[in-house]
Amino acid sequence: MTPKSQAINPLMQREIAQHYPSTSITAILNLLSQAEAGYLTAQAELFTDMEERDAHIYAEMTKRKMAVAQLDWSLKPNRSAGAREKRAVMDLEELIKDTFDIETLVFDMANAIGHGFMALELQWGRDATGFWMPKTFNPRPTRWFTVDQATRQNLRLRDNQSIDGVELVQYGWIVHEHSSKTTGEPGTQGLYRALALPYLFKNFATKNWLRFCELYAVPIRVLFHHEKDEGKKQAILYSLQAMGQNGVALLEGGTQDDLKTVDSATGEGQGFLNLIQWCEASVSKAILGG
């Protein structure tokens, strides 16, 4: 038997991932509903955004994946195995340890924790003795995959011919499906589904916190002047603005040209920080337990 690699649509290999609004509850809920109906692409792209845009999700998920990847492992023969079979298992274990970076392989497969599944494409080649051996394990983006519409249980490769995609080539893939709950299809088992709303709420809070800082953290500069020429007044205003962000004012009057720095207006931004902390605590509980 000659192992084969999957023929992947070159257009899909050059496909650019879409990015989805991180402040729209309706958009995110629609993506999750589409995945329940068997359309996984948009959800997969959202999950990738979550990993890349939220440092807390990235850090906590990395902790969990590293904890799995660093575990010791071994191959055990069947209890009824004879001496020859036991020796074959020992030889296979030595071959795997000498040939493959299992820690990296397991770390890559652990992406299934968040996404619900992970598929690594195998590239085969012959070794020095002529035996076929896997040469590389290439993690493929989860947006490349779909499920059959009849059962929504069988992971398949997307193509341009059918919404069911095409079957994965035998011996061409290592597929790990992770179950974050007791029932469901591969597209609904990812832990990131539970993190989508905390991720959304944190984005709300972060953007509002940045607006708060912009409004209340910049001193206000006020210049009282007696200049009548509009051109000169505009030049003075530009000079003030060049001193920093636009917390400036140009007012006519006063006894002399006088630059005043006014203390920033008081405000309370703790509510935004509390929401951010709650979202991060929820994420940590979901990923690491607690």
Language model: regions and residue ranges:
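Structured, contiguous alpha/beta core segments that scaffold functional sites
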Residues: 2-50, 58, 83-249, 254
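Extended, low-complexity, charged intrinsically disordered regions
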Residues: 63-67
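Solvent-exposed, flexible loop/coil residues
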Residues: 79, 141, 263-266
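Long amphipathic alpha-helical segments
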Residues: 231-290
